[in-house]
């Protein structure tokens, strides 16, 4: 409805607050889905997402879901060897990556790690989409790598592809600390129903309220409670890049809570 379209669905951290409405998110997702569709991505294809904690990571996840493609998010900055294992295991048709991530006191280049992972992997993706960040732009390999903004600017919005409730939504790999990483598959229907139930019955969170899971989209808590649970329940999700106990200091955690969870939406000076 019109109220939901205007509602904030994602807020990107305090001091540098970026607000994204449900309507804006839907438009961004549909455009990226159109770009993926134009590159041949279809229902059932696997797409690896190798991005930092930025709204574009959420857009990438939802764009895959919009096409019925299966996303597999790999924790941003993971070693090339670990990324290569996941490329081979899921036979990724495409990879969506960020040019870099931001950590306390440093910038982490992602593209060199991605390039090395692809060289190590036996399976080669058809193409990569790179979201270029102002902090560090990446060199693109002609014919394989494509600029996110260039593709999206030329794409038409893609409609939702119907899927069955038992169709896979995503593959998320275990850490691999006790052996070979194992890909856990979650289905579309039951997973979303259960997440919506937990928001109401575990957390007492309702539409229009603000929810912050201080995790990462590369882990299951981030999948569940940064992305899918808040969105399916109509709440506003907080997305934070960096370490909330150390970017720049341990007080950041409480500043974000004070600014975004307990401050009026009109307070633009957070």
What residues fall within each predicted segment?
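Conserved adenylation A10 loop of the ANL superfamily
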Residues: 13-14, 171-183, 199, 263-267
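A short helix-loop-beta submotif of the ANL/AMP-binding
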Residues: 46, 52-80, 90-95, 209-210, ...
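Conserved pre-ATP/AMP-binding loop-to-beta segment of ANL
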Residues: 128-131, 142-173, 180, 190, ...
